Amino acid sequence: ALSLSALGIRIIAPIPGKGTIGIEVPNFNPQIVSMKTMLTSPQFVDTKYELPIAIGKTISSEPYVADLAKMPHLLMAGATGQGKSVGLNAIISSLLFKKHPCDLKFVMVDPKKVELSLYSKIERHYLAKLPDSEEAIITDVKKVVRTLNSLCIEMDQRYDLLKIAGCKKITEYNAKFCSRR
């Protein structure tokens, strides 16, 4: 840390799941990681993940790809200007790049009215909306509750289908449905 002229370091002891100690030194020469680099990397292209998302690069500068399907919850938080929108766009772009419209639908809520507007161009393919809605991207906070209630109804109907089919996961159900068993 002294030879790098680092103002501060963080020690992670032990690194979870490993018998090692980590020393995190801030990088004062950060590199821009382009989305194209991530989406064309072998780690992303060749992945067998159900819902692959390209997050960024590891400390060893390797592309990092995670499976959104394996995450029970995902919270993105931070101060203004810290990259939350960039991260969200990376997740959305990853899924759009890897999935066909028949396999993926988004319900987008954008109370700021400007964060997700660029996705209005894919409305007919990737965005789900209520039958009586004019816009696929919800910007009116009053309509959010109604949309979430509709999603809960859809979720309950899907759970009923899983129960009838004797499946616990959507992947099991899809495999059963595709093979017509």
For the regions a protein language model found, what residue spans apply to each?
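P-loop NTPase catalytic phosphate-binding loop
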Residues: 1-3, 10-24, 37-168, 181
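Short, charged/polar, Gly/Pro-enriched secondary-structure boundary elements
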Residues: 28-34
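Cytosolic-facing regulatory segments adjacent to core modules
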Residues: 169-176
